């Protein structure tokens, strides 16, 4: 096994993903010993069936991709996803509240969802494409203060994805207290490796097979 495979959340979040593609994603994750598959909630149950006797985790997304659902809706989505078999939750923060510096709202949202997660991993997507440097620092400090496990760069649906400078910034703020997931537009091994070296402990990509088999 490639030593980098364990960092991978093998991702398929496109709106027109087919059941056959989900099955293939799961097979690839098992064969390559990726950490998880990251899929939309409607596929969690079937992916759990495919991966039942493997070590591959099931990761799904909440409030995706805009983050604009109410807290109550996100809490329900989270509980439902876990009931269906999700091991990890990648939630999109309320981006408007984050941009406007509403610390109390952001913390309340994250912590309510983490309460439902229990011992399941919670990653918080802050969609860096919409944030300036000061807002990225604020986002990291929110995560540091919250009960979340990870901060995550992007949904993959915005105009920009992961940037090395953001991983470096967050690692400086978070240290080893919280983890970092880089995602969005990661298509080559050089970027993949540089994100890990900068402090990311998980990489979300739909191109993992190409990236890791060709380096």
From Swiss-Prot:
What Gene Ontology molecular-function terms does this entry list? deoxyribose-phosphate aldolase activity
Q: Which GO terms describe its biological process?
A: 2-deoxyribose 1-phosphate catabolic process; carbohydrate catabolic process; deoxyribonucleotide catabolic process
Q: Which Gene3D superfamilies match?
A: Aldolase class I
* Top-level EC class as recorded in UniProt: lyase
Per UniProt, what is one Pfam family of this protein?
DeoC
* Reactions it catalyzes: 2-deoxy-D-ribose 5-phosphate = D-glyceraldehyde 3-phosphate + acetaldehyde
Q: Does the keyword field hold ATP-binding?
A: no
Keywords from UniProt, A to Z, are: Cytoplasm, Lyase, Schiff base
Instruction: Please state the protein's primary subcellular location.
Output: cytoplasm
Involved pathway(s): Carbohydrate degradation; 2-deoxy-D-ribose 1-phosphate degradation; D-glyceraldehyde 3-phosphate and acetaldehyde from 2-deoxy-alpha-D-ribose 1-phosphate: step 2/2
Q: Which SMART domains match?
A: DeoC (SM01133)
* Cellular-component GO terms for this entry: cytoplasm
Catalytic center residues: 90, 152, 181
Entry similarity comment: Belongs to the DeoC/FbaB aldolase family. DeoC type 1 subfamily.
Q: What does this protein do?
A: Catalyzes a reversible aldol reaction between acetaldehyde and D-glyceraldehyde 3-phosphate to generate 2-deoxy-D-ribose 5-phosphate.
Which protein is depicted?
Answer: Deoxyribose-phosphate aldolase
Q: Which organism is it from?
A: Ureaplasma parvum serovar 3 (strain ATCC 700970)
